[in-house]
């Protein structure tokens, strides 16, 4: 059962006709990273955690997870191992996957890192950004990031951005800038974006609003705040498309998928 938990925490669907039909799900081997507790997240990522293709044909998948099976890690007063951000690699087109590298991990088990997104720049540099929470109260911190110059075999020291939100999705735009989109689950709620010249220098001055609202009435929906999880692409005509989820209006709020399309300034 321990081996099964380590190998079936994440699955993939595959399409050979540009998304018209799909096969799967196919279990992904994530060993030695295992499911971290029965009451929280399994090994996984975020909705926008793109798989990155390398020049040699290898594929990198950014994920989160913990190696030990500590069911008390996220309980009040827990001290067990928290999530790390790591990557899997496939060299056969995504049929088989193996652990490749840890992107970021706090051995003190104070910083909880999860829901990563990764993009490869034209220079060859990889940029990975992720959601962060801090013990003991698991407060939501700003997003953090790291970079790699060797196709993900090793990573820079993690750095904290000035951007609050979660989780992020990253792409490099046609003009070379890097765009991060992320959920904003406080105040007016919604989805926000921020551009960086190099994927490493991030400023609140470059933050903008993509959508607002989408949260539900907390007296009606327990997880009224569960919105966003954006995924972003840039079309050939240069427009940017962001997909995300939010609650509908009305007496019985339902989760709906929305798409916003816009041009970058």
What is each of the regions a protein language model found here?
Residues 1-265:
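Asp-box/BNR beta-propeller blade signature and adjacent active/binding-site loops
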